[in-house]
From Swiss-Prot:
Location of the region described as Disordered in the Swiss-Prot/TrEMBL record: 1-29
The name this protein goes by in its record: Kelch-like protein 2
Subunit record text: Component of the BCR(KLHL2) E3 ubiquitin ligase complex, at least composed of CUL3 and KLHL2 and RBX1. Binds actin. Interacts with KLHL12. Interacts (via N-terminus) with FYN (via SH3 domain).
Expression (tissue specificity): Detected in brain neurons, oligodendrocytes and astrocytes (at protein level).
Biased composition (Basic and acidic residues): 17-29
Short name of one Pfam family: Kelch_1
Source species: Rattus norvegicus
Length: 593
């Protein structure tokens, strides 16, 4: 029986035409079939052949590792091997090729990748994998390594990643690590990596217009810390470093009380000249300051890093573990990892890229435990305990140390103060306050730590007194009193001014707000909040002062409102927390990338 005839060649009209027709090309009109699995299957078979040492025509050697392979596969996937095997080098004919620049295990991983397109990048192997991928010109692997390192950026390692990226010509990673260091400057300068930088690298960093800092104090203190880390060698660089510190942008009080008293400044005539320049700037009328143009009078213009407000624990109505974050850009709340244990009435700070929950009350006991939260890992970790049990304490960061101020230990109000060194993971006592203060609010302005109001437990009265701590002198000094007694007031700092928000005097819960100006040592009233609040959290972000939760004397509040100093007006945020809570810890953090 004859086979059926082949179908005719395709034509537009469906008629038969000879295949050699000059006016029609059948390839134009017949569909092209592409099998996406063909290459994958082919490489799978080639890898199986390699594993059985079949048809292999070269052995790649590194250290004591011997890896059989196929020249054509290596040449097809790696420009390095392509040049080696198709050129006139002796390796093009050799049965064994030794690679001296790469260790055996790393080379095996990369040749495995050539055959399988699979590779696992980890913290342990990325520093050897990336340069090896660069040598073999496996750009996809190098890119994967860079993306992994970018995901690991943190204040404690970004400078090291920046140097690594520079060494291996990873331009995109270099730029991202540099931007990260600028955006997290206040935390980066607390790291060992910063203290171990060379002078050129420090100057490059502190001269950037893009530094994200709350005040130029951060730059000055970073310079002093870097020099003191190896004082005998580095003090000769003081003048060169101070050229990049914008002293005219610092408050006059800070210049007099901190900069002028710094021994490293006193011992340098050039540094004194920069200080004189700054003092002259402050003495000039505003309109004349515009004429005094220099790099040190120019405002830094950082990129706006997205922020999150973190609300930790609190009473609702008992101590809770819940942690909520508010995204200012998206205007919504979301839950993150819970506290390891119930905690309310704790101190709260953001330091070195971590949130610290300090002391507090767990529902039955006042505690001295401290937990830290890593926003990148969404994970809580315990650190060293305080020396004393404290609840309703104040917590703040001054000169790279975390201070726990006053509070209540379960039997009496406390005047004691202790500080935490994150590098040594140790707490130590400093000078006590002049007054016992529980339910105290604290804030840092101009290099001084302020303790505002509270309850002394002895007179059984709420306090209107305020005192400030000078870390250099290790002493507390009374300053001007508030206009009214406030215990459980929220305290925040905005534009170098100290705000005392709400609080109570006995059963009277307040919605009034007053603000302290260190330059005049005086308090003044500003607009009242929309509702009475005590034991609320306070934080400043984007030029606004936020007040979170608290209670009004009868119930816990889930609402949030913010104060705009330009309009002297309070506005209630449309989105509330998932639950009303008072005595919660509140702070603002950089949104994880």
């Amino acid at each position: 029986m004859e086979s059926p005839p082949l179908p005719p060649a395709c034509t537009k009209q469906g008629h038969q035409k000879p295949l050699d027709s000059k006016d029609e090309n059948p390839e134009k009109h017949c569909p092209l079939t592409v099998n996406p699995w063909h290459m994958k299957k082919a490489f799978k078979v080639m890898n199986e052949l390699r594993s059985q040492n079949l048809l292999c025509d070269v052995t790649i050697v590194a250290e004591d590792m011997e890896i059989p392979a196929h020249r054509v596969v290596l040449a097809a996937c790696s420009p390095y091997f392509h040049a080696m095997f198709t050129g006139e080098m002796s390796e093009s004919r050799a049965k064994r090729v030794r690679i001296k620049e790469v260790d055996g295990w790393t080379l095996r991983m990369l040749i495995d990748y050539v055959y399988t397109a699979e590779i696992q990048v980890t913290e342990e192997n990325v520093q050897v994998l990336l340069p090896a991928a660069g040598l073999l010109q496996l750009q996809d692997v190098k890119k994967t390594c860079c993306e992994f390192l970018e995901s690991q950026l943190h204040p404690v390692n970004c400078l090291g990643i920046r140097a690594f990226a520079d060494m291996h010509a990873c331009t995109d990673l270099l730029n991202k690590a540099n931007t990260y260091a600028e955006q997290h400057f206040a935390d980066v300068v607390l790291s060992e990596e910063f203290l171990n930088l060379g002078i050129e690298q420090v100057c490059s960093l502190i001269s950037s217009d893009k530094l994200t800092i709350s005040s130029e104090e951060k730059v000055f203190e970073a310079v002093i810390a870097w020099v003191n880390h190896d004082k005998d060698v580095r003090q000769e660089f003081m003048a060169r470093l101070m050229e990049h510190v914008r002293l005219p942008l610092l408050p006059r009080e800070y210049l007099v009380q901190r900069v002028e008293e710094e021994a490293l400044v006193k011992n340098s005539s050039a540094c004194k000249d920069y200080l004189i320049e700054a003092m002259k700037y402050h003495l000039l009328p505003t309109e004349q300051r515009m004429l005094m143009k220099s790099v040190r009078t120019r405002l830094r213009t950082p990129m706006n890093l997205p922020k999150l407000m973190v609300v930790v624990g609190g009473q609702a109505p008992k101590a809770i573990r819940s942690v909520e974050c508010y995204d200012f850009k998206e205007e919504r709340w979301h839950q993150v990892a819970e506290l390891p244990s119930r905690r309310c009435r704790a101190g709260m700070v953001y330091m070195a890229g971590l949130v610290f929950a300090v002391g507090g009350f767990n529902g039955s006991l006042r505690v001295r435990t401290v937990d830290s939260y890593d926003p990148v890992k969404d994970q809580w970790t315990s650190v060293a305990n305080m020396r004393d049990r404290r609840s309703t304490l104040g917590a703040a960061v001054l000169n790279g140390l975390l201070y726990a101020v006053g509070g209540f230990d379960g039997s009496t109000g406390l005047s004691s103060v202790e500080a935490y060194n994150i590098k040594s993971n140790e707490w130590f006592h400093v000078a006590p306050m002049n007054t016992r203060r529980s339910s105290v609010g604290v804030g840092v302005v101009g290099g001084l730590l302020y303790a505002v109001g509270g309850y002394d437990g002895a007179s059984r009265q709420c306090l209107s007194t305020v005192e400030c701590y000078n870390a250099t002198a290790n002493e507390w000094t009374y300053i001007a009193e508030m206009s009214t007694r406030r215990s459980g007031a929220g305290v925040g700092v905005l534009n170098n001014l100290l705000y005392a928000v709400g609080g109570h005097d006995g059963p009277l819960v307040r919605k009034s707000v007053e603000v302290y100006d260190p330059t005049t040592n005086a308090w003044r009233q500003v607009a009242d909040m929309n509702m009475c609040r005590r034991n609320a959290g306070v934080c400043a972000v984007n030029g606004l002062l936020y007040v979170v939760g608290g209670d009004d004397g009868s119930c816990n509040l889930a609402s949030v409102e913010y104060y705009n100093p330009t309009t002297d007006k309070w506005t209630v945020v449309s989105s509330c927390m998932s639950t009303g809570r008072s005595y919660a810890g509140v702070t603002v953090i950089d949104k994880p990338l």
